[in-house]
Amino acid sequence: MISPFKDKGFSLLFLTTVSASLGDMFMDVSSGWLVLELTNSPLSLGLFWAVRSSPNLLFGMVGGATADKMDRRKLLIICYTLYVFCGLVFGFLIISGLIQLYHALALIFIRGIIRTFENPSRQSFIVDLVGRANAMNGISLNAVGMRGIGIVGGALAGLIIELFGKEWPFFVLSGLFLVSVFLVASINSVVTKRVAQQLSVWRNLEEGIQIVSQNKLVLALMLMAATCEMFGFSFPVLVPVFARDILKVGAIGNGMINAFRSGGGLLASLALASLGDSRHKGKLLLVMFLMFGVGLILYANTPIYVFALIFMGMVGVSAAGHDAMSQILLQLNVDEEQRGRAMGMWQLSIGFGILGSMTLGSLAEAYGAIFAQSVFGGLMVLIVVLMYLTVPKLKEL
């Protein structure tokens, strides 16, 4: 389980993930709460999260192709530096009293574009550092850092908002991303033999499309990722609504719900890392998908805050488990030089979350948050049953 930490580069990248993930959690919790305070509208929250997801759809494959073309270390440094500036602009707009919904939408869109380059670079860089044999351990342990710090990040962001104001989490997250810049800069570049480095980004894009058209298993994994993103990972849209209007627990409660989500994710990541190179990756993927849907239904229908936290922990376990297994299976079912583009295709798949975010927000505006979230959880259960019956090869992975 701990073998990847023998590599100094992986250890530094792990610390980078911890710092950057704390910044990400601050951004998600604080910006979602900000939008609800500005608009008092679930539909606006849906729009906000749709804008956040849209760059994945527009630039996902470009980001993956660029990760195969460029030095991944240098690309990560650029991405984290740009995150610093996004956080500072957010903070100064709030403290000046100028912040409007369109500012938040523009900044979260820019942040989303950066993420389409950062995520495939970071995930592919993990495998560069630890090798394909340790890919499951490396990716799972990296997820441990991400989910583990999210427990602190969710609760801390809510506390900072309550005690010091809405602007301070954005200044703190800028400092965290600056730490990430210095950590990545300390990693020695890993030179891997990549045919993609000899090709243009557009040629890499063409080859990415060919991978999907020729590899039916990759297509199935992308479809699962897309539907999971639409109906499962859209749930953060309504977390501020559940916290403020249904459970009546305020900004701190909103942070705690996100903390339990990360806590569940931490448990899943630790479990996957301890499994090593499991022979049942496909079955695990299907189980996580099913748990995700059931967890959302239970979370949406409990009026008791403590139970809501427990069910959100269940959602966190299944969300993190599905995320990790999806990324691992994509990287292991393509050629070595195609891993960046594989992650770009995954990024493209999760871009379909834009449809889920807008639909969930619209349903909540019209029929209430409980109904909307329950419908999406039910659709998750239906989809995984259909995938189990129609794609038998998934069970064999």
Q: Which residues does each predicted region cover?
A:
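Helix-loop boundary and gating motifs at the non-cytosolic
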Residues: 1-55, 214-261
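Helix-boundary and loop/linker segments of multi-pass membrane transporters
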Residues: 2-7, 22, 96-98, 197, ...
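Substrate-agnostic recognition of the 12-TM MFS/MFS-like secondary transporter fold
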Residues: 11-28, 51-65, 71-86, 103-161, ...
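Transmembrane alpha-helix termini and helix-breaking/packing motifs in multi-pass membrane transporters
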Residues: 32-38, 91-96, 152-172, 245-246, ...
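Helix-breaking motifs and short loop linkers at transmembrane-helix boundaries and internal kinks
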Residues: 39, 71, 93-98, 301-303
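C-terminal transmembrane bundle of multi-pass solute transporters/carriers
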Residues: 58-61, 69, 73-75, 79, ...
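Helix-loop junctions on the cytosolic side of multi-pass membrane transporters
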Residues: 124, 128, 170, 174-199, ...
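Short amphipathic alpha-helical coupling elements at transmembrane boundaries
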Residues: 127, 140-143, 203, 207-214
